[in-house]
């Protein structure tokens, strides 16, 4: 599958999961398709999904991230040993871990296409991230206290881990 076919497969699969949306027309324009895909990923509840979807999603997201350009921490200059300050697209940072400004449920922002760090990280990591967060929270049995964090694999992000830090919402 080429990138366009992968994107269409992902969109159709996510639409098929939502009975009220399965007849949603898919835009012909690739940029509008990307917006629709991101929105569908943003509203998807944590749940298992088939292996074929994950394989296509992983290839697609990794390709999209590579096209944005990956920033490797080894090319940055630390301000102190082991401490780096960097500004840019956090979903392109290749390092040990990035920090997600999360809500107390840790499963992400469910507002479609909302431009927040939580949505960006959950979108480019893939649907596995939300499920991993849900599993951690179910095991814990209560919302994450403000100022506390949980760590998950980064899935399709170039970093190794995501630290989900529960913050106060003002």
List the model feature ranges, each with a label.
Residues 59-101:
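Long amphipathic N-terminal alpha/beta scaffold segment
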Residues 168-170:
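Conserved small/polar residues in nucleotide/adenosyl-binding loops
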Residues 1-76:
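Non-catalytic accessory regions outside enzyme or core folds
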Residues 135-165:
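Active-site alpha/beta core segments
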Residues 68-69, 85, 128-129, 148-152:
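Short, charged low-complexity intrinsically disordered segments located at boundaries
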Residues 21-27, 87-89, 152:
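Short, functional N-terminal and low-complexity linear motifs
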Residues 87-141, 146:
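Short, conserved "active-site rim" segments that organize catalytic pockets and cofactor/ligand binding
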Residues 45-71, 105-125, 153-156:
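Short, charge-rich amphipathic segments
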């Amino acid at each position: 599958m080429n990138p366009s076919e992968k994107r269409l497969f992902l969109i159709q699969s996510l639409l098929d999961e939502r009975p009220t949306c399965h007849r949603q027309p898919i835009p012909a324009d690739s940029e509008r398709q990307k917006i629709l895909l991101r929105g569908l990923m943003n509203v998807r509840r944590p749940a298992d999904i088939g292996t074929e979807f994950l394989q296509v999603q992983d290839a697609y997201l990794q390709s999209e991230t590579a096209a944005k350009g990956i920033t490797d921490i080894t090319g940055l200059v630390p301000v102190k040993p082991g401490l780096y300050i960097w500004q840019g697209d956090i979903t392109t940072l290749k390092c040990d871990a990035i920090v997600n400004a999360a809500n107390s449920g840790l499963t992400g922002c469910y507002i479609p296409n909302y431009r927040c760090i939580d949505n960006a990280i959950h979108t480019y990591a893939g649907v596995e991230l939300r499920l991993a967060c849900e599993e951690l929270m179910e095991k814990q049995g209560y919302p994450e206290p403000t100022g506390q964090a949980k760590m998950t694999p980064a899935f399709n992000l170039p970093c190794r881990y995501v630290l989900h830090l529960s913050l106060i919402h003002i």
